Amino acid sequence: MKGYSIILGLLALAACSDNTPENPGEGGGDSGEIVSVEKSVTIDAGQTFQKMVGFGASDCWTPAYIGKYWTSGRDRISELLFSSEIVDGQPKGIGLSMWRVNLGGGSAEQGDESGIVDKSRRAESYLTDNLSLDWTHCEGQRYFMSRAKEFGVNNYVLFSNTPPVQYTLNGKGFSQNGGSANLKADCYDDFAAYMAEVAKHYVDEGFSISHISPVNEPQYNWDGNGQEGSGWKNDEIAKLARELDSQLTQKGLSTNILLGESGDWEYLYKVKDDASRSNVLSAFF
């Protein structure tokens, strides 16, 4: 039985205004009073509240194109992302230790027939029309994975916005199925097998695939033509997770399944909008 994980991220929202005061450092309304914002902070290094598993980012979307086409700039960009080297007191990069890799649905191969207007929101897939796997696909993503490995990154998360178009109900990488999964009823096992096979391929290539995130922000319908995506109900996610668990076990992989993906904090802990797509923690854990 694979492990089931939940990784939570913090979204910080910043508001800006065109009405900048003449003296930004002053406050207190019309009084002109200066308000002190000094704070005293004490850090106890001996007390641990949580463990950070990794510091990561995602290759979705433009790195796929930078890695494939921008050969003059990609080496420096990858250094900025992954290097932890410090020279003369200056870091050469931000030292990412985790890299999130998009398992695209194949809309890039469809071109304009994909229905996705923005070319940068189309993504390649390893799955071909005859349902074989072509490991020469996703060249740009493979470049960044290899560079991450060179710089010592040892945690990779495979994630999916949509099932491969060969398995979707509408043959597209975006959904027209409302809040339900854009996945044929008889293709849950096929989709799971595909994700597990990609994970095994990269494990065999020497990459540590720590997690697979099989769905992305499932509370949204993704029924526009802006990018790849699919809505999912909790019971559909559970069914897919069981199939994926079986496939990972069969292949002898220790890769964990990342559940609890959510488009909004509140979907995690309470019923919001659609009960069948929210209260995620109670539904899965």
Placement of each model-derived feature along the sequence:
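Sec-dependent signal peptide recognition
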Residues: M1-G9
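Short hydrophobic transmembrane-like helices used for membrane targeting/insertion
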Residues: I6-I7, I34, I212
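Residue-level signal for mature regions of secreted extracellular proteins and peptides
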Residues: G9-L10, Q50
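Disulfide-bonded cysteine motifs in exported proteins
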Residues: L11-A12, I77
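Bacterial Sec-dependent N-terminal signal peptides
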Residues: L13-V37
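N-terminal catalytic cores of secreted or lumenal carbohydrate-active enzymes
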Residues: E38, I43-I209, D235, R242
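Conserved beta-strand positions
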Residues: A57, V101, L158, P214-E217, ...
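Active-site neighborhood of glycoside hydrolase catalytic domains
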Residues: D189-H211, P218-F285
